[in-house]
């Protein structure tokens, strides 16, 4: 069994102001995505300035934050937030939905593309390889917060999370680290290598949807579902898995469509 590193969720406190690691992970994810996007900017559109790229990253980040929070409210805990709407603003306590953030990003990309003469999938193909940076950082934030841990297990790398998070004090799968490895590292490598060569429009977006859906679906088998929801069906199906099914199907559909229509190869 591995010891859980006791990390204070507050990274820095200046008087009453507290800066949480969870929030810093979002900044790291956004900053890392911007740096990598700037490396590929000329391939995407040589006429774009760094300022326009910054605008794109800003609006997509807003989509992630707003969509992620609203998605969690709608998909995972609507009753609690209807009872106390101010909880929506307590983002440092966690409670973000990837699927909600993904919808927010799509809406932001659609809006930004129309204003800048770019198609929706042109932007999504450009952005998709950058997303795992934020996903990986977010999962590290979950780990530091000692939240979203896995089921009890006797594997050698099991961890006992702090009592405030897990009163049962059982050795558990560190499922946040599994998601970091799959959704952050593995997904980044797959998309970054795949998008290094010109691909048909929609192919990179399809690869993202397909592999994220597969990775998340797999990890959900060892991750404890949100207490207020539990399992949706059959004693094992979670809300996360339900939301991943359309992503997997959409990913397969986009890849098939990309390679079976008239080829229009463009750099991602």
Curated annotation (Swiss-Prot):
Topology relative to the lipid bilayer, per the entry, is: Multi-pass membrane protein
Q: Where are the transmembrane segments?
A: 10-30, 56-76, 92-112, 120-140, 174-194, 202-222, 236-256
Q: Which PROSITE patterns match?
A: LGT
Q: What Enzyme Commission number(s) appear in the record?
A: 2.5.1.145
The answer on whether this UniProt entry bears the keyword Cell membrane reads yes
Which InterPro entries does the record match to this protein? Answer: Lgt
Molecular function, one GO term = phosphatidylglycerol-prolipoprotein diacylglyceryl transferase activity
Sorted keywords for this record are: Cell inner membrane, Cell membrane, Membrane, Transferase, Transmembrane, Transmembrane helix
Give any Gene Ontology cellular component: plasma membrane
Please name the top-level EC class of this enzyme: transferase
Q: Give the location in the cell.
A: Cell inner membrane
Q: What positions does the entry give for a 1,2-diacyl-sn-glycero-3-phospho-(1'-sn-glycerol) binding?
A: 139
Q: Give the primary localization class.
A: membrane
Keyword Cell inner membrane in the entry? The reply is: yes
Instruction: List GO BP terms, alphabetically.
Output: lipoprotein biosynthetic process
Output the NCBIfam families linked to this UniProt entry.
Answer: lgt
Similarity comment: family membership: Belongs to the Lgt family.
Q: What does this protein do?
A: Catalyzes the transfer of the diacylglyceryl group from phosphatidylglycerol to the sulfhydryl group of the N-terminal cysteine of a prolipoprotein, the first step in the formation of mature lipoproteins.
> Protein name, please?
Phosphatidylglycerol--prolipoprotein diacylglyceryl transferase
The species is Pseudomonas putida (strain ATCC 700007 / DSM 6899 / JCM 31910 / BCRC 17059 / LMG 24140 / F1)
Taxonomically, what lineage is the organism? Bacteria, Pseudomonadati, Pseudomonadota, Gammaproteobacteria, Pseudomonadales
